[in-house]
């Protein structure tokens, strides 16, 4: 399915609401786009899917680069005059800039990126995960779909979800079924890959409208977070029983959720300096306070030795909790306090994460043995655009990542340097 310029403008007509007004009558939100020919088209085309401040906060691009980037979002080929007007406006008002510079750390480790562009334009591909047969499932949040990629052929099949699901993630249960979180319509569900038929569970709590991240125990019981609803949930798919508890009385924004080796759940706090430890049977919550002021945590991963590694997104750090001793240690991320680390995965004794708050989005490798960093820019075609929001490890020891703005699923193969460039890109 391709999204045309006309369809984007029609969608924007319904989505483009007036700015909120404060008591003093001044509009809230980011400054308006610069005046000029093309502004109405850009507002109409872009605002139907994402906030206009994403354009203003971008690293800027040349005209050819804007052509490539917008080409992942909407098909303007049948409206060449309007396309030229849009590209001229974007290139003039948002040329390349260095407002959020990344700091690349050199080293002697080589990685190779391989990428695939998913079919539906503007879907914001995210959260790829490997299935038992080697295929890769992913969520297309803005496309209201989940998809299945055959990495051998590059072909993908995409499955439409019930209206307004807006899947925030896809996760596989012990039976290999792909589950999605209905982040906009308060549902959890799974798809039958053969028929495409969804099985959907509606949340019984009227305030639990945004299921977020999903995980499973060995029995297939589903556990999940609600970021804005400030809750944690559990679903028994066999009985349909759902239990939901508040994560805390304070605004916490539970985000990521994973099991440790002892069968306890760990949950990240995206609104304040904490992690949550949750008993899977009772859903009793124990809070672990983190030391750095301004800490917010997007994601975590559990190492084979039981250590809990997390990204301190709010303060630009990488952190580690020793569950046995309670010791907490943090390291400054290379690109600084505004680098906003996001996704994280433990792979082959190293910690891999990204710095989403800088441009380009940086993939970072941390060696805990000698406490050293190395980093690489994540490239999307001929541009640097998009954000990595989740990372998963494959059975072959590679890393599955993505870039939302360019609808890409990516595989990172790590290995020792053998000379040549620090990064090689293959397609």
Language model regions located:
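Short loop/turn segments that connect beta-strands within beta-propeller blades
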Residues: 150-154, 192-196, 236-240, 279-283, ...
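Beta-rich, blade/repeat-based domains predominating
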Residues: 121-133, 163-175, 206-219, 250-262, ...
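Blade-level signature of beta-propeller repeat domains, shared across WD40, Kelch, NHL, RCC1
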Residues: 385-427
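C-terminal capping alpha-helices of c-type cytochrome domains
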Residues: 75-103, 399
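A short helix->beta-strand "capping" segment at the edge of beta-propeller domains
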Residues: 103-122
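Electrostatic cytochrome c docking/interface patches
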Residues: 21-41, 117
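Conserved beta-strand positions in repeat-built beta-propeller and related beta-rich domains
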Residues: 136-142, 178-184, 222-228, 265-271, ...
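The canonical Cys-X-X-Cys-His
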Residues: 42-53, 86, 90, 146
């Amino acid at each position: 399915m391709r999204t045309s310029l006309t369809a984007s403008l029609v969608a924007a007509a319904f989505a483009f609401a007036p700015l909120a007004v404060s008591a003093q009558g001044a509009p809230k939100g980011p400054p308006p786009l610069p005046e000029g020919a093309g502004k109405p088209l850009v507002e109409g085309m872009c605002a139907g899917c994402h906030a206009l401040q994403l354009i203003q906060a971008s690293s800027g691009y040349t005209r050819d680069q804007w052509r490539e980037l917008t080409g992942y979002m909407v098909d303007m080929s049948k409206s060449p005059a309007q396309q030229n007007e849009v590209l001229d406006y974007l290139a003039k008002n948002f040329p390349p800039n260095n407002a959020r510079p990344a700091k690349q750390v050199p080293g002697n480790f080589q990685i190779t990126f391989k990428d695939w562009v998913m079919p539906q334009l503007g879907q914001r591909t995210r959260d790829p995960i490997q299935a038992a047969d080697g295929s890769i499932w992913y969520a297309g949040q803005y496309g209201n779909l989940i998809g299945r990629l055959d990495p051998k052929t590059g072909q993908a099949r995409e499955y439409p979800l019930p209206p307004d699901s807006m899947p925030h993630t896809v996760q596989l249960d012990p039976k290999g079924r792909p589950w999605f979180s209905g982040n906009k319509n308060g549902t959890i569900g799974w798809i039958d890959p053969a028929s495409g038929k969804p099985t959907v569970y509606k949340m019984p709590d009227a305030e639990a409208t945004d299921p977020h991240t999903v995980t499973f125990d060995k029995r297939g019981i589903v556990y999940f977070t609600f970021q804005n609803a400030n809750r944690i949930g559990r679903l028994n798919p066999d009985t349909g029983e759902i239990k939901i508890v508040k994560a805390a009385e304070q605004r916490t924004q539970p985000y990521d959720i994973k099991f440790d080796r002892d069968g306890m759940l760990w949950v990240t706090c995206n609104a304040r300096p904490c992690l949550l430890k949750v008993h899977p049977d009772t859903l009793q919550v124990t809070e672990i306070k983190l030391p750095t002021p301004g800490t917010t945590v997007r994601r975590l991963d559990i190492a084979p030795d039981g250590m809990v590694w997390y990204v301190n997104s709010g303060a630009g750090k990488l952190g580690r909790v020793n569950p046995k001793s309670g010791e907490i240690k943090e390291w400054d991320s290379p690109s600084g306090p505004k680098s906003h680390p996001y996704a994280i995965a433990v792979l082959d004794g190293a910690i891999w994460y990204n710095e989403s708050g800088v441009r380009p989005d940086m993939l970072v490798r941390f060696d805990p043995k000698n406490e050293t960093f190395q980093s690489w820019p994540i490239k999307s075609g001929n541009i640097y655009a998009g954000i990595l929001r989740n990372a998963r490890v494959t059975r072959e020891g590679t890393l599955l990542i993505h870039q939302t703005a360019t609808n890409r699923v990516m595989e990172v193969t790590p290995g020792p340097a053998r000379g040549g460039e620090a990064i090689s890109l293959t397609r």
